[in-house]
Amino acid sequence: MFENEKRMAAMEALKFVRNDMRIGIGTGSTAYYFIEGLSELVKNGLRITGIPTSKKSEELCRSFNIPVDYNIKDIDIDFDGADEFDPYGNLIKGGGGALVREKIVAYNSREFYVLVDHSKYSERLHKFPLPVEVLPFMSEKTLENIERLGCRASFRDDKKFISDNGNYIIDCVFSYTDPELESQIKMIPGVVEVGIFRHLSTKIFQGTIDGCRIIDVK
């Protein structure tokens, strides 16, 4: 439904890629359009090194002959999608199950550019369940402890979904996903990472019906 808007956001973000950059390459449907467009630039002589945030994105990069290297200390820009964002640049991420690697790459990048369609905007984060990656060990108890914070929680695909790190994803439905919940949830033993991304995004590329709006996050 919003495929053209996702493509618009990806194409606009690609204009910021320069020779010899080391870039984070995200996961998901919008990131696919970015990878597809990046492959054309590489084919035409652009020199970059990519740090994919999931095995799926790594496979895509390699199939498009995009150089990949995980042994990079400094990342210039991370390009990734989001499930939801608010006016302050807070994000919900992890719908594709790659939130741990996505957060590692975003945190270690000088800039974090978020590519979305117009439907991903919310005044308050509430539309998308909050993904939380947890260790399999005593995971039922971890879920119970998360629910004590006031949400309805369930294992993604009844534990059939396994992250690239070998863990489960718990999807949490809050009436409002307060960004402050990130630290509270991370204090629960068994929690690996939380899909709230605070103070990380620097630009948001929001695809629209007739172009792309670039939002500078203050």
Swiss-Prot record:
InterPro entries according to UniProt: NagB/RpiA_transferase-like, Ribose5P_isomerase_typA_subgr, Ribose5P_isomerase_type_A
First-tier enzyme category under EC: isomerase
EC number: 5.3.1.6
Gene name of this polypeptide: rpiA
GO MF term (any one): ribose-5-phosphate isomerase activity
Record-level GO cellular component terms: cytosol
Catalytic residues (positions): E102
Keywords: Isomerase
GO terms for biological process, alphabetical: D-ribose metabolic process; pentose-phosphate shunt, non-oxidative branch
Function: Catalyzes the reversible conversion of ribose-5-phosphate to ribulose 5-phosphate.
Organism: Picrophilus torridus (strain ATCC 700027 / DSM 9790 / JCM 10055 / NBRC 100828 / KAW 2/3)
Xref: CDD domains: RPI_A
Catalytic activity: aldehydo-D-ribose 5-phosphate = D-ribulose 5-phosphate
Protein name stated in the entry: Ribose-5-phosphate isomerase A
Similarity comment text for this entry: Belongs to the ribose 5-phosphate isomerase family.
Binding-site residues, substrate: T27, G28, S29, T30, D80, G81, A82, D83, K93, G94, G95, G96, K120
